[in-house]
Design a protein with these regions (language model features):
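Hydrophobic (often cysteine-bearing) scaffold residues that line and stabilize catalytic clefts
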Residues: 4, 9, 147, 151, ...
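Internal, well-ordered alpha-helical segments in soluble enzyme and binding-protein domains
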Residues: 127, 131, 151-154, 171
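Active-site-proximal alpha-helical segments within enzyme catalytic domains
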Residues: 48-51, 151-161
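Short, well-structured active-site flanking segments
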Residues: 14-33, 162-182
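Active-site-proximal loop and beta-strand segments within enzyme catalytic domains
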Residues: 1-147
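Generic preference for hydrophobic/aromatic residues in regular secondary structure cores
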Residues: 135, 151, 179-182
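Short, charged N-terminal helix-start/capping segments
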Residues: 72-74, 79-81, 155, 164-169
């Protein structure tokens, strides 16, 4: 995910900046109506890029996708046992036999499942709105450097709002296809 921040989101933001379609001093709320009447309405594009927006470092969105009754014990923990053997990080192991909430994920693209998250895995389109709601409701701290995934999720939304395309489609059209990288 950190690589995507610099090779995808940042690339798109730089292009839109060069084209005069956004300014670093613009509040993200200019492009994201969900932020307008919140404590996040004045967060600027620059603050998001520099991780100085006051946003929380991360939100565990996956928790909203997991059927809590399909998990034995906690979903993640710091050691391997018979239920937790999928390594997610250096000291983090996930429950390996969980199930997604009913209707949230599909093996094929459908009118409701439009967000591709992996080959053969499509997420319900409403999950993106639920993620934004979690961001809007999250705490906002003092504006100082705190590495945050949330800022780059918002930058992705800004790019998509300006271009009218998904970040993936915009990058393919503006960068990858012209460079012969499809």
């Amino acid at each position: 995910a950190s690589l995507t921040k610099t090779t995808a989101t940042l690339l798109a933001v730089m292009k839109l900046y060069d084209q005069g379609q956004l300014k670093l001093t613009d509040p993200a709320s200019k492009y994201l109506p969900a932020l307008r009447n919140t404590n996040k309405k004045n967060i600027t594009i620059r603050e998001l890029l520099l991780h100085e927006s006051g946003l929380v470092p991360y939100i565990r969105f996956y928790r909203n996708a997991i059927d809590e009754y399909s998990v034995t014990g906690p979903f993640t923990q710091g050691f391997v046992d018979e239920w937790h053997h999928t390594r997610m990080g250096e000291y983090t192991y996930a429950c390996s036999d969980f199930k997604f909430r009913r209707g949230l994920v599909s093996a094929t693209k459908t009118p409701e499942h439009t967000l591709k998250i992996a080959d053969g895995m499509w997420l319900h389109r409403k999950f993106k709105a639920a993620m934004m709601k979690s961001i809007v409701q999250s705490e906002l701290a003092r504006k100082r450097f705190v590495y945050s995934d949330i800022g780059f999720i918002l930058l992705q939304q800004v790019v998509e709002s300006i271009t009218g395309q998904t970040l993936d489609a915009y990058l393919v059209a503006e960068f990858y296809r012209p460079m012969g990288l499809e």
